[in-house]
Amino acid sequence: MKRKNFAACALALALLVLAGCSNSASDSKPDTTPQATPTAEAANGKTVSPLPSGVDLQHLNDCMVAVSFDKGDAFVDGKGAMQLKVKVYAYDAFDTVDINKLQVGDQITICQQNVKVTSLEQDKNAAVLINGGADNGGYTLVSGEASGFYAVGPNDTKLYYALGEATIPVSSDLVLEDSSDLEKGTRTYYAGDFLTDGSGLTYHFVPDNTTITIEGGYVTHMQRVYTP
């Protein structure tokens, strides 16, 4: 009888030991629950994008755009209509709130390029200098427009980038107001002056100084201004 009781007790003790081992193994099992990983914004900073330019190469019907073109890009087509082949440009404008929140470690898209912000400061004119500013290989943002800040180059003119090319019909009433030469003052040219060598028109039409106005799909006005 004692032997039976001893066997029963031994069996019960063995079961308790096994149960204890099972719980211990469960408690020490590595935690395989997936851990949260930093988002791109948390790890690399946020990305500040410019406001939409509003320029659509496929619908240049009623707008004013910065352009460049060379001698010979104004021509008469096979149907007798004057055309102007241009490169169309845009510049980046940024919301003031976005620029005020910009920090070192963020990225900002300028001229369709993502720029890592490694240094950030403000000069005495309240211009925002990114990575040393335009004079030191970086970028300079200035305010002064309703849209907020925009990027400028070393000569303080807007920093343009090309969107593409377009050939646009020219109105017979086209007027060019040319004030690119301070010594000569403002001069006026007309559509036909682009088609002749005797007009005295000089060719330096670049986005820094030239804009065209398009109305109803036709170039109706052009302005060229002085740039330093």
Which positions does each model-derived feature cover?
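Solvent-exposed hydroxyl-ligand-binding patches built from regularly spaced Ser/Thr
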Residues: 34-228
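Bacterial N-terminal signal peptides that target proteins for export
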Residues: 1-9
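Bacterial signal peptide processing site
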Residues: 22-24
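C-terminal motif of bacterial Sec signal peptides marking the signal peptidase cleavage site
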Residues: 17-20
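Repetitive helical segments and hydrophobic/amphipathic motifs
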Residues: 11-13
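Conserved nucleotide-sugar donor-binding catalytic segment
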Residues: 27-30
